[in-house]
Protein backbone atom coordinates (compact mmCIF):
# COMPACT_ATOMS: atom_id res chain seq x y z
CA UNK A 1 0.00 0.00 0.00
CA UNK A 2 1.32 3.44 -0.94
CA UNK A 3 0.49 6.06 1.68
CA UNK A 4 -0.11 9.60 0.46
CA UNK A 5 2.01 12.37 1.99
CA UNK A 6 0.78 15.38 3.93
CA UNK A 7 4.16 17.08 4.54
CA UNK A 8 7.85 16.78 3.75
CA UNK A 9 10.35 18.50 6.04
CA UNK A 10 12.30 21.44 4.67
CA UNK A 11 15.52 19.42 4.71
CA UNK A 12 13.72 16.75 2.60
CA UNK A 13 14.80 14.06 5.07
CA UNK A 14 11.50 13.32 6.81
CA UNK A 15 8.02 12.55 5.50
CA UNK A 16 4.64 12.67 7.22
CA UNK A 17 1.77 10.72 5.69
CA UNK A 18 -1.79 12.03 5.64
CA UNK A 19 -2.73 9.21 8.01
CA UNK A 20 -0.01 10.21 10.49
CA UNK A 21 -0.98 13.87 10.34
CA UNK A 22 -4.66 13.00 10.76
CA UNK A 23 -3.90 10.94 13.86
CA UNK A 24 -1.85 13.79 15.35
CA UNK A 25 -4.62 16.33 14.74
CA UNK A 26 -7.21 13.82 15.99
CA UNK A 27 -5.43 13.52 19.34
CA UNK A 28 -4.95 17.27 19.70
CA UNK A 29 -8.56 18.02 18.77
CA UNK A 30 -9.73 15.43 21.27
CA UNK A 31 -7.67 16.95 24.08
CA UNK A 32 -8.82 20.49 23.31
CA UNK A 33 -12.44 19.53 22.70
CA UNK A 34 -12.65 17.41 25.84
CA UNK A 35 -12.21 20.51 27.99
CA UNK A 36 -15.41 21.85 26.41
CA UNK A 37 -17.28 18.53 26.39
CA UNK A 38 -17.11 18.42 22.57
CA UNK A 39 -14.22 15.98 22.06
CA UNK A 40 -16.11 13.85 19.53
CA UNK A 41 -17.22 16.83 17.44
CA UNK A 42 -13.62 18.07 17.33
CA UNK A 43 -12.31 14.60 16.47
CA UNK A 44 -14.71 14.26 13.54
CA UNK A 45 -13.37 17.56 12.19
CA UNK A 46 -9.85 16.16 12.50
CA UNK A 47 -10.63 12.85 10.78
CA UNK A 48 -12.06 14.49 7.66
CA UNK A 49 -10.03 17.72 7.47
CA UNK A 50 -7.28 16.47 5.12
CA UNK A 51 -8.74 13.47 3.31
CA UNK A 52 -8.65 15.66 0.19
CA UNK A 53 -4.89 15.07 0.15
CA UNK A 54 -5.53 11.38 -0.54
CA UNK A 55 -5.07 11.73 -4.31
CA UNK A 56 -2.14 11.40 -6.67
CA UNK A 57 -2.22 14.99 -7.90
CA UNK A 58 -1.69 16.29 -4.36
CA UNK A 59 0.93 13.65 -3.58
CA UNK A 60 2.85 14.72 -6.70
CA UNK A 61 2.54 18.35 -5.63
CA UNK A 62 4.00 17.62 -2.19
CA UNK A 63 6.92 15.69 -3.72
CA UNK A 64 7.66 18.32 -6.39
CA UNK A 65 10.60 20.72 -6.15
CA UNK A 66 10.12 24.11 -4.52
CA UNK A 67 9.67 26.06 -7.76
CA UNK A 68 6.87 23.77 -8.92
CA UNK A 69 5.21 23.99 -5.51
CA UNK A 70 5.32 27.78 -5.63
CA UNK A 71 3.75 27.84 -9.08
CA UNK A 72 0.94 25.52 -7.97
CA UNK A 73 0.38 26.98 -4.49
CA UNK A 74 -3.35 27.42 -3.86
CA UNK A 75 -4.33 25.70 -7.12
CA UNK A 76 -4.68 22.16 -5.79
CA UNK A 77 -7.61 22.46 -3.40
CA UNK A 78 -8.05 19.72 -0.82
CA UNK A 79 -10.18 20.99 2.09
CA UNK A 80 -13.56 20.72 0.32
CA UNK A 81 -13.29 16.96 -0.23
CA UNK A 82 -13.77 16.16 3.45
CA UNK A 83 -16.63 18.64 3.62
CA UNK A 84 -18.32 16.94 0.65
CA UNK A 85 -17.88 13.50 2.21
CA UNK A 86 -19.46 14.55 5.52
CA UNK A 87 -22.24 16.54 3.87
CA UNK A 88 -23.30 13.74 1.54
CA UNK A 89 -23.18 11.05 4.22
CA UNK A 90 -24.82 12.81 7.16
CA UNK A 91 -26.93 15.70 5.82
CA UNK A 92 -29.91 13.39 5.39
CA UNK A 93 -31.14 12.50 8.88
CA UNK A 94 -32.99 14.46 11.56
CA UNK A 95 -32.44 18.14 12.34
CA UNK A 96 -29.55 17.34 14.66
CA UNK A 97 -27.85 15.32 11.89
CA UNK A 98 -28.29 18.23 9.52
CA UNK A 99 -26.86 20.73 12.01
CA UNK A 100 -23.93 18.52 13.02
CA UNK A 101 -23.02 17.72 9.41
CA UNK A 102 -23.09 21.42 8.54
CA UNK A 103 -20.85 22.34 11.49
CA UNK A 104 -18.28 19.65 10.71
CA UNK A 105 -18.30 20.10 6.94
CA UNK A 106 -17.89 23.88 7.19
CA UNK A 107 -15.03 23.55 9.69
CA UNK A 108 -13.29 21.12 7.33
CA UNK A 109 -13.87 23.31 4.26
CA UNK A 110 -12.79 26.50 6.05
CA UNK A 111 -9.71 25.32 7.94
CA UNK A 112 -7.46 27.02 5.36
CA UNK A 113 -9.64 30.13 5.08
CA UNK A 114 -13.19 31.09 6.01
CA UNK A 115 -15.82 31.92 3.42
CA UNK A 116 -19.48 32.97 3.37
CA UNK A 117 -21.86 30.08 2.83
CA UNK A 118 -24.33 32.44 1.17
CA UNK A 119 -23.25 35.47 -0.87
CA UNK A 120 -24.99 38.85 -1.10
CA UNK A 121 -26.89 37.73 -4.19
CA UNK A 122 -28.37 34.77 -2.31
CA UNK A 123 -26.31 32.09 -4.04
CA UNK A 124 -25.21 29.22 -1.82
CA UNK A 125 -21.41 29.30 -1.98
CA UNK A 126 -21.03 26.17 0.13
CA UNK A 127 -23.00 23.96 -2.25
CA UNK A 128 -21.17 25.41 -5.24
CA UNK A 129 -17.85 24.76 -3.51
CA UNK A 130 -18.43 21.07 -2.85
CA UNK A 131 -19.89 20.55 -6.32
CA UNK A 132 -16.53 21.67 -7.76
CA UNK A 133 -14.53 19.00 -5.90
CA UNK A 134 -12.27 17.05 -8.24
CA UNK A 135 -11.00 13.46 -7.99
CA UNK A 136 -13.62 12.72 -5.32
CA UNK A 137 -13.91 9.00 -6.09
CA UNK A 138 -10.14 8.59 -5.78
CA UNK A 139 -10.18 10.52 -2.50
CA UNK A 140 -12.98 8.36 -1.09
CA UNK A 141 -11.28 5.10 -2.09
CA UNK A 142 -7.85 6.04 -0.73
CA UNK A 143 -9.05 7.73 2.46
CA UNK A 144 -11.40 4.88 3.39
CA UNK A 145 -8.49 2.46 3.02
CA UNK A 146 -5.74 4.55 4.65
CA UNK A 147 -7.59 6.70 7.22
CA UNK A 148 -11.30 6.20 7.81
CA UNK A 149 -11.10 2.46 8.44
CA UNK A 150 -8.87 3.14 11.48
CA UNK A 151 -11.61 4.95 13.39
CA UNK A 152 -14.98 3.83 14.73
CA UNK A 153 -16.63 6.76 12.98
CA UNK A 154 -20.22 5.68 13.63
CA UNK A 155 -19.59 5.57 17.38
CA UNK A 156 -17.74 8.89 17.33
CA UNK A 157 -20.57 10.42 15.31
CA UNK A 158 -23.26 9.17 17.74
CA UNK A 159 -21.31 10.65 20.66
CA UNK A 160 -20.88 13.89 18.72
CA UNK A 161 -24.66 14.12 18.28
CA UNK A 162 -25.10 13.83 22.05
CA UNK A 163 -22.50 16.57 22.58
CA UNK A 164 -24.21 18.87 20.10
CA UNK A 165 -27.58 18.23 21.77
CA UNK A 166 -26.11 19.35 25.11
CA UNK A 167 -24.63 22.47 23.50
CA UNK A 168 -27.96 23.21 21.83
CA UNK A 169 -29.75 22.95 25.18
CA UNK A 170 -27.32 25.45 26.72
CA UNK A 171 -27.99 27.87 23.88
CA UNK A 172 -31.77 27.43 24.14
CA UNK A 173 -31.67 28.06 27.89
CA UNK A 174 -29.60 31.18 27.27
CA UNK A 175 -32.15 32.53 24.79
CA UNK A 176 -35.02 31.78 27.19
CA UNK A 177 -33.10 33.47 29.97
CA UNK A 178 -32.91 36.61 27.86
CA UNK A 179 -36.72 36.55 27.56
CA UNK A 180 -36.56 37.50 23.89
CA UNK A 181 -39.61 38.10 21.73
CA UNK A 182 -40.37 35.62 18.97
CA UNK A 183 -38.83 37.88 16.34
CA UNK A 184 -35.53 37.85 18.22
CA UNK A 185 -35.23 34.13 18.94
CA UNK A 186 -34.19 32.99 15.46
CA UNK A 187 -31.57 35.72 15.16
CA UNK A 188 -30.09 34.90 18.55
CA UNK A 189 -30.14 31.16 17.89
CA UNK A 190 -28.33 31.64 14.58
CA UNK A 191 -25.76 33.93 16.20
CA UNK A 192 -24.98 31.47 18.98
CA UNK A 193 -24.77 28.55 16.55
CA UNK A 194 -22.33 30.60 14.47
CA UNK A 195 -20.30 31.17 17.64
CA UNK A 196 -20.18 27.42 18.18
CA UNK A 197 -19.20 26.89 14.54
CA UNK A 198 -16.28 29.27 15.09
CA UNK A 199 -15.32 27.42 18.27
CA UNK A 200 -15.13 24.09 16.44
CA UNK A 201 -13.12 25.72 13.64
CA UNK A 202 -10.78 27.27 16.22
CA UNK A 203 -9.96 23.88 17.71
CA UNK A 204 -9.34 22.36 14.27
CA UNK A 205 -7.11 25.18 12.99
CA UNK A 206 -5.05 25.29 16.18
CA UNK A 207 -4.59 21.51 16.24
CA UNK A 208 -3.72 21.40 12.52
CA UNK A 209 -1.11 24.15 12.90
CA UNK A 210 0.31 22.59 16.05
CA UNK A 211 0.81 19.15 14.52
CA UNK A 212 2.24 20.66 11.33
CA UNK A 213 4.69 22.83 13.30
CA UNK A 214 5.67 19.84 15.39
CA UNK A 215 6.59 17.87 12.26
CA UNK A 216 7.98 20.58 9.97
CA UNK A 217 10.12 22.42 12.50
CA UNK A 218 10.14 19.83 15.27
CA UNK A 219 8.51 22.40 17.55
CA UNK A 220 6.85 21.12 20.69
CA UNK A 221 4.17 23.41 22.11
CA UNK A 222 4.84 24.54 25.66
CA UNK A 223 2.56 22.79 28.13
CA UNK A 224 1.72 24.71 31.29
CA UNK A 225 0.12 22.83 34.17
CA UNK A 226 -2.37 25.55 35.05
CA UNK A 227 -3.26 24.28 38.51
CA UNK A 228 0.40 24.13 39.51
CA UNK A 229 1.22 27.51 37.93
CA UNK A 230 -1.70 29.28 39.61
CA UNK A 231 -0.77 27.79 43.00
CA UNK A 232 2.79 29.09 42.67
CA UNK A 233 1.56 32.43 41.30
CA UNK A 234 -0.81 32.79 44.25
CA UNK A 235 2.04 32.27 46.72
CA UNK A 236 4.21 34.74 44.82
CA UNK A 237 1.33 37.23 44.78
CA UNK A 238 0.98 37.05 48.57
CA UNK A 239 4.71 37.68 48.97
CA UNK A 240 4.49 40.59 46.51
CA UNK A 241 1.63 42.19 48.45
CA UNK A 242 3.56 41.75 51.68
CA UNK A 243 6.54 43.51 50.07
CA UNK A 244 4.27 46.40 49.09
CA UNK A 245 2.98 46.61 52.66
CA UNK A 246 6.49 46.62 54.14
CA UNK A 247 7.63 49.27 51.65
CA UNK A 248 4.59 51.42 52.44
CA UNK A 249 5.11 51.21 56.19
CA UNK A 250 8.79 52.16 55.97
CA UNK A 251 7.96 55.76 55.12
CA UNK A 252 6.01 58.22 57.18
CA UNK A 253 2.55 58.57 55.62
CA UNK A 254 -0.23 61.10 55.94
CA UNK A 255 -3.57 60.08 57.44
CA UNK A 256 -5.09 60.27 53.96
CA UNK A 257 -2.44 57.94 52.51
CA UNK A 258 -2.91 55.44 55.35
CA UNK A 259 -6.66 55.53 54.84
CA UNK A 260 -6.37 54.91 51.08
CA UNK A 261 -3.95 52.02 51.64
CA UNK A 262 -6.35 50.43 54.13
CA UNK A 263 -9.32 50.81 51.76
CA UNK A 264 -7.38 49.21 48.88
CA UNK A 265 -6.66 46.19 51.09
CA UNK A 266 -10.34 45.99 52.06
CA UNK A 267 -11.37 46.04 48.39
CA UNK A 268 -8.86 43.33 47.59
CA UNK A 269 -10.18 41.20 50.45
CA UNK A 270 -13.72 41.56 49.08
CA UNK A 271 -12.52 40.40 45.67
CA UNK A 272 -10.84 37.34 47.15
CA UNK A 273 -13.97 36.44 49.11
CA UNK A 274 -16.11 36.84 45.98
CA UNK A 275 -14.09 34.12 44.22
CA UNK A 276 -16.22 31.46 45.91
CA UNK A 277 -19.08 32.31 43.54
CA UNK A 278 -19.61 30.15 40.48
CA UNK A 279 -18.61 30.95 36.89
CA UNK A 280 -20.56 33.95 35.62
CA UNK A 281 -20.43 37.51 34.33
CA UNK A 282 -19.66 40.04 37.06
CA UNK A 283 -18.85 43.71 37.57
CA UNK A 284 -15.81 44.99 39.41
CA UNK A 285 -16.49 48.68 39.98
CA UNK A 286 -13.52 50.32 41.66
CA UNK A 287 -12.88 54.07 41.85
CA UNK A 288 -9.83 55.50 40.13
CA UNK A 289 -6.87 54.88 42.43
CA UNK A 290 -8.52 51.90 44.08
CA UNK A 291 -6.07 49.34 42.71
CA UNK A 292 -8.16 47.67 39.99
CA UNK A 293 -5.28 45.69 38.49
CA UNK A 294 -4.10 44.02 41.69
CA UNK A 295 -7.65 43.56 43.01
CA UNK A 296 -8.70 41.90 39.76
CA UNK A 297 -5.61 39.68 39.80
CA UNK A 298 -6.21 38.71 43.43
CA UNK A 299 -9.75 37.66 42.50
CA UNK A 300 -8.60 35.68 39.46
CA UNK A 301 -5.97 33.76 41.44
CA UNK A 302 -8.44 33.06 44.25
CA UNK A 303 -11.01 31.90 41.68
CA UNK A 304 -8.46 29.55 40.11
CA UNK A 305 -7.84 28.05 43.55
CA UNK A 306 -11.57 27.60 44.21
CA UNK A 307 -12.18 26.25 40.69
CA UNK A 308 -9.25 23.93 39.76
CA UNK A 309 -10.38 23.60 36.13
CA UNK A 310 -9.40 27.21 35.40
CA UNK A 311 -6.97 27.21 32.47
CA UNK A 312 -5.98 30.85 31.93
CA UNK A 313 -6.31 34.36 33.28
CA UNK A 314 -6.80 37.10 30.69
CA UNK A 315 -6.28 40.79 31.32
CA UNK A 316 -7.77 42.88 28.52
CA UNK A 317 -7.59 46.67 28.23
CA UNK A 318 -8.64 49.09 25.48
CA UNK A 319 -5.34 50.90 25.07
CA UNK A 320 -1.77 49.73 24.54
CA UNK A 321 -0.60 52.32 27.08
CA UNK A 322 -2.77 50.69 29.77
CA UNK A 323 -1.44 47.22 28.89
CA UNK A 324 2.16 48.45 29.00
CA UNK A 325 1.54 50.06 32.37
CA UNK A 326 -0.07 47.01 33.95
CA UNK A 327 1.74 44.05 32.39
CA UNK A 328 4.92 44.78 34.36
CA UNK A 329 2.87 44.89 37.56
CA UNK A 330 1.28 41.53 36.72
CA UNK A 331 4.66 39.95 35.91
CA UNK A 332 6.12 41.12 39.22
CA UNK A 333 3.03 40.04 41.13
CA UNK A 334 2.93 36.46 39.77
CA UNK A 335 6.70 36.09 39.97
CA UNK A 336 7.56 34.55 36.59
CA UNK A 337 7.76 36.43 33.28
CA UNK A 338 7.48 33.18 31.28
CA UNK A 339 3.94 32.68 32.53
CA UNK A 340 2.79 36.02 31.13
CA UNK A 341 2.17 36.74 27.44
CA UNK A 342 1.94 40.37 26.33
CA UNK A 343 0.16 40.52 22.97
CA UNK A 344 -0.43 43.75 21.10
CA UNK A 345 0.86 45.61 18.06
CA UNK A 346 3.71 47.38 19.90
CA UNK A 347 5.35 44.32 21.40
CA UNK A 348 8.91 43.99 20.10
CA UNK A 349 10.44 40.53 20.05
CA UNK A 350 13.66 39.23 18.60
CA UNK A 351 13.19 37.18 15.41
CA UNK A 352 9.53 38.19 15.42
CA UNK A 353 8.93 36.86 11.91
CA UNK A 354 10.36 33.42 12.64
CA UNK A 355 7.70 30.70 12.41
CA UNK A 356 8.47 29.38 15.87
CA UNK A 357 7.84 32.80 17.41
CA UNK A 358 4.65 33.21 15.43
CA UNK A 359 3.47 29.89 16.86
CA UNK A 360 4.41 30.60 20.47
CA UNK A 361 3.61 34.31 20.61
CA UNK A 362 0.11 34.27 19.24
CA UNK A 363 -1.46 30.98 20.30
CA UNK A 364 -2.32 32.22 23.82
CA UNK A 365 -1.00 29.08 25.50
CA UNK A 366 0.43 30.94 28.50
CA UNK A 367 -1.45 30.88 31.84
CA UNK A 368 -1.60 34.71 31.91
CA UNK A 369 -2.41 36.67 28.75
CA UNK A 370 -2.37 40.48 28.66
CA UNK A 371 -3.83 41.84 25.45
CA UNK A 372 -5.82 44.68 23.97
CA UNK A 373 -9.54 44.89 23.36
CA UNK A 374 -8.75 44.95 19.62
CA UNK A 375 -6.92 41.61 19.78
CA UNK A 376 -9.69 40.18 21.96
CA UNK A 377 -12.40 41.21 19.49
CA UNK A 378 -10.26 39.97 16.58
CA UNK A 379 -10.14 36.57 18.25
CA UNK A 380 -13.93 36.56 18.48
CA UNK A 381 -14.84 38.05 15.09
CA UNK A 382 -11.90 38.40 12.66
CA UNK A 383 -11.70 36.21 9.55
CA UNK A 384 -7.93 35.78 10.01
CA UNK A 385 -6.90 32.20 10.81
CA UNK A 386 -4.38 33.24 13.47
CA UNK A 387 -7.22 35.04 15.28
CA UNK A 388 -9.77 32.23 14.91
CA UNK A 389 -7.38 29.61 16.29
CA UNK A 390 -7.13 31.49 19.61
CA UNK A 391 -10.85 31.48 20.40
CA UNK A 392 -10.96 28.13 22.20
CA UNK A 393 -8.25 29.35 24.59
CA UNK A 394 -10.86 31.60 26.22
CA UNK A 395 -12.79 28.58 27.50
CA UNK A 396 -12.54 27.72 31.21
CA UNK A 397 -10.70 30.99 31.82
CA UNK A 398 -11.05 34.13 33.90
CA UNK A 399 -11.42 37.08 31.53
CA UNK A 400 -10.89 40.51 33.11
CA UNK A 401 -11.89 43.31 30.76
CA UNK A 402 -10.57 46.62 32.09
CA UNK A 403 -11.98 50.04 31.18
CA UNK A 404 -14.92 48.36 29.47
CA UNK A 405 -16.66 51.73 29.13
CA UNK A 406 -14.15 52.57 26.37
CA UNK A 407 -15.73 49.95 24.09
CA UNK A 408 -17.13 51.57 20.90
CA UNK A 409 -20.92 51.81 20.95
CA UNK A 410 -21.15 49.93 17.63
CA UNK A 411 -19.62 46.87 19.32
CA UNK A 412 -22.09 46.61 22.21
CA UNK A 413 -24.60 44.15 20.72
CA UNK A 414 -22.08 41.68 19.34
CA UNK A 415 -20.00 42.04 22.51
CA UNK A 416 -23.01 41.20 24.69
CA UNK A 417 -23.95 38.21 22.55
CA UNK A 418 -20.42 36.84 22.64
CA UNK A 419 -19.94 37.37 26.40
CA UNK A 420 -23.15 35.44 27.04
CA UNK A 421 -21.89 32.65 24.76
CA UNK A 422 -18.43 32.50 26.34
CA UNK A 423 -19.90 32.30 29.82
CA UNK A 424 -22.71 29.84 29.12
CA UNK A 425 -21.20 27.53 26.50
CA UNK A 426 -17.45 27.94 27.06
CA UNK A 427 -17.52 28.14 30.87
CA UNK A 428 -15.60 31.43 30.88
CA UNK A 429 -15.72 33.59 34.01
CA UNK A 430 -15.98 37.22 32.89
CA UNK A 431 -15.24 40.33 34.96
CA UNK A 432 -16.08 43.77 33.56
CA UNK A 433 -13.83 46.15 35.39
CA UNK A 434 -14.08 49.96 35.41
CA UNK A 435 -14.78 52.99 37.55
CA UNK A 436 -17.75 53.91 35.32
CA UNK A 437 -19.77 50.83 34.34
CA UNK A 438 -21.75 51.10 31.08
CA UNK A 439 -25.36 49.84 31.09
CA UNK A 440 -24.71 46.66 29.14
CA UNK A 441 -27.72 44.99 30.77
CA UNK A 442 -30.12 47.76 29.67
CA UNK A 443 -33.48 46.02 29.29
CA UNK A 444 -34.28 47.78 26.02
CA UNK A 445 -31.27 46.20 24.32
CA UNK A 446 -32.11 43.41 21.89
CA UNK A 447 -29.38 41.46 23.64
CA UNK A 448 -28.53 42.65 27.15
CA UNK A 449 -25.55 41.11 28.85
CA UNK A 450 -26.65 38.41 31.29
CA UNK A 451 -25.01 39.33 34.59
CA UNK A 452 -24.85 36.68 37.29
CA UNK A 453 -26.13 37.17 40.82
CA UNK A 454 -24.78 38.79 42.87
CA UNK A 455 -23.56 41.05 40.07
CA UNK A 456 -21.20 43.44 41.86
CA UNK A 457 -18.03 42.14 43.45
CA UNK A 458 -17.69 45.20 45.69
CA UNK A 459 -20.37 46.19 48.19
CA UNK A 460 -21.25 49.75 49.27
CA UNK A 461 -20.10 51.25 45.97
CA UNK A 462 -21.33 54.73 46.84
CA UNK A 463 -19.26 54.79 50.00
CA UNK A 464 -16.16 53.49 48.20
CA UNK A 465 -16.35 56.18 45.53
CA UNK A 466 -16.67 58.92 48.16
CA UNK A 467 -13.61 57.54 49.95
CA UNK A 468 -11.55 58.01 46.78
CA UNK A 469 -12.64 61.53 45.92
CA UNK A 470 -9.24 63.16 45.48
CA UNK A 471 -9.86 65.43 42.51
CA UNK A 472 -11.89 68.61 42.25
CA UNK A 473 -13.14 69.49 38.77
CA UNK A 474 -13.28 73.23 38.13
CA UNK A 475 -14.70 74.04 34.67
CA UNK A 476 -12.98 76.90 32.85
CA UNK A 477 -16.05 78.55 31.32
CA UNK A 478 -15.52 80.29 28.00
CA UNK A 479 -17.93 81.46 25.35
CA UNK A 480 -15.72 79.89 22.69
CA UNK A 481 -13.51 76.81 22.68
CA UNK A 482 -9.75 77.21 22.98
CA UNK A 483 -7.68 77.24 19.86
CA UNK A 484 -4.57 75.12 20.28
CA UNK A 485 -2.25 78.12 20.36
CA UNK A 486 -4.48 79.80 22.97
CA UNK A 487 -4.47 76.64 25.06
CA UNK A 488 -0.67 76.50 24.95
CA UNK A 489 -0.42 80.13 26.04
CA UNK A 490 -2.86 79.54 28.91
CA UNK A 491 -0.79 76.57 30.07
CA UNK A 492 2.33 78.73 29.82
CA UNK A 493 0.75 81.27 32.17
CA UNK A 494 -0.29 78.53 34.62
CA UNK A 495 3.33 77.32 34.87
CA UNK A 496 4.13 80.27 37.12
CA UNK A 497 1.44 79.13 39.59
CA UNK A 498 1.68 75.35 39.58
CA UNK A 499 4.73 73.14 39.95
CA UNK A 500 3.38 70.41 37.68
CA UNK A 501 0.71 70.45 34.95
CA UNK A 502 -0.77 67.48 33.10
CA UNK A 503 -2.51 68.17 29.78
CA UNK A 504 -4.66 65.47 28.15
CA UNK A 505 -5.69 65.96 24.52
CA UNK A 506 -7.73 63.76 22.21
CA UNK A 507 -5.54 63.67 19.08
CA UNK A 508 -1.85 63.23 18.34
CA UNK A 509 -1.84 66.32 16.12
CA UNK A 510 -3.18 68.42 18.99
CA UNK A 511 -0.48 67.06 21.30
CA UNK A 512 2.22 67.91 18.77
CA UNK A 513 0.91 71.47 18.23
CA UNK A 514 0.61 72.31 21.94
CA UNK A 515 3.98 70.72 22.72
CA UNK A 516 5.79 72.68 20.00
CA UNK A 517 4.14 75.97 21.01
CA UNK A 518 4.97 75.47 24.69
CA UNK A 519 8.63 74.91 23.88
CA UNK A 520 8.58 78.26 22.10
CA UNK A 521 7.03 80.31 24.92
CA UNK A 522 8.14 78.85 28.28
CA UNK A 523 11.49 79.46 29.93
CA UNK A 524 14.32 76.98 29.38
CA UNK A 525 14.13 75.90 33.03
CA UNK A 526 10.64 74.50 32.42
CA UNK A 527 10.74 70.88 31.28
CA UNK A 528 8.07 70.05 28.69
CA UNK A 529 7.48 66.41 27.77
CA UNK A 530 4.92 64.58 25.65
CA UNK A 531 3.62 61.05 25.20
CA UNK A 532 1.75 59.70 22.17
CA UNK A 533 1.54 56.38 20.37
CA UNK A 534 3.70 57.92 17.63
CA UNK A 535 6.51 56.99 20.00
CA UNK A 536 7.45 53.33 20.10
CA UNK A 537 6.72 51.42 23.29
CA UNK A 538 10.34 51.40 24.45
CA UNK A 539 10.66 55.17 23.93
CA UNK A 540 7.48 55.84 25.92
CA UNK A 541 8.70 53.61 28.74
CA UNK A 542 12.01 55.50 28.93
CA UNK A 543 10.18 58.83 29.08
CA UNK A 544 7.93 57.60 31.91
CA UNK A 545 10.91 56.32 33.89
Regions found by a protein language model. Name each.
Residues 2-12, 18-239:
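Accessory nucleic-acid engagement/destabilization modules that flank
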Residues 7-10, 341-353, 506-509, 528-542:
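Conserved helicase motor
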Residues 278-300:
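Walker A/P-loop
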Residues 310-334, 347, 439, 508:
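Conserved Walker A/P-loop ATP-binding site and its immediately adjacent core
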Residues 312-323, 494-519:
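Conserved strand-helix element at the start of the C-terminal RecA-like helicase core
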Residues 336-381:
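Inter-Walker segment of RecA-like/P-loop motor cores
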Residues 376, 387-425, 430:
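SF2 helicase catalytic motif II
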Residues 436-494:
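Interdomain hinge/linker at the junction between the two RecA-like core domains of SF2 helicases
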Amino acid sequence: MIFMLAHISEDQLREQTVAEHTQGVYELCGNKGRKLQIANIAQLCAIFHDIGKEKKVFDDYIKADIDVQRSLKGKIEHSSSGAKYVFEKYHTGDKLDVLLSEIISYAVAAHHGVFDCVNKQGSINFTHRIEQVQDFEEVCHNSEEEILSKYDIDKIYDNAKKELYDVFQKIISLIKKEQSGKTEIKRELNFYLACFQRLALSILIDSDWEDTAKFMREIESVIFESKEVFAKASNNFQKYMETIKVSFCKKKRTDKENKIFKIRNEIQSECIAFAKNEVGIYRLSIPTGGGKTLSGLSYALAFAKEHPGTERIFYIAPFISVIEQNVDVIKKAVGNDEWVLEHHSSVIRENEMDDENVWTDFSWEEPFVCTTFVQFMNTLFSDKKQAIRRMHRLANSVIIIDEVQAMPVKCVYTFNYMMNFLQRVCNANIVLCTATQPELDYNKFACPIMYSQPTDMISNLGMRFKQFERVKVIPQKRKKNYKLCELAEEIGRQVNTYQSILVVLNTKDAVSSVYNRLNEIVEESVHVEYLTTNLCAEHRSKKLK
